[in-house]
Amino acid sequence: MLISVLKSKISYATVTGKDLFYVGSITIDSEIMKQANIIENEKVQVVNLNNGERLETYVIKGEPNSKTIALNGPAARRCEIGDQLFIISYTQVDPTRENIKPKLVDLKTGD
């Protein structure tokens, strides 16, 4: 048996763009992805702090150091530019495994 646990969390990501007619996904600056240990096409949960919306999508790699956080496709209707997001990924682990340390990136403080 496996359980889902927090793998990575990007806190206080600011929406910089949205493209309603793109196929789908969230575009994230590749440097932020690297800091958070999130890879391209990984499934993530997106939580919008401004309106309480939650959604699941997959990640597209954005230009490095661009600070891009852009929701694409139908997800673009769930946010506005300037909204603050939590972007969360999970992994499956054996429940007997201890000392699982998620990668946390806080864009508000720069940690």
From Swiss-Prot:
Pathway: Cofactor biosynthesis; (R)-pantothenate biosynthesis; beta-alanine from L-aspartate: step 1/1. GO terms for molecular function: aspartate 1-decarboxylase activity. Keywords: Autocatalytic cleavage, Cytoplasm, Decarboxylase, Lyase, Pantothenate biosynthesis, Pyruvate, Schiff base, Zymogen. Its cofactor is pyruvate. GO terms for biological process: alanine biosynthetic process; pantothenate biosynthetic process. Pfam families: Asp_decarbox. Gene3D superfamilies: 2.40.40.20. One of its GO terms (cellular component) is cytosol. The keyword Disulfide bond does not apply. Its EC number is 4.1.1.11. The active site is at S25, Y58. The modification Pyruvic acid (Ser) is found at S25. It comes from the Bacteria. It is found in: Cytoplasm. Heterooctamer of four alpha and four beta subunits. Catalyzes the pyruvoyl-dependent decarboxylation of aspartate to produce beta-alanine. This is Aspartate 1-decarboxylase. It comes from Francisella tularensis subsp. tularensis (strain SCHU S4 / Schu 4).
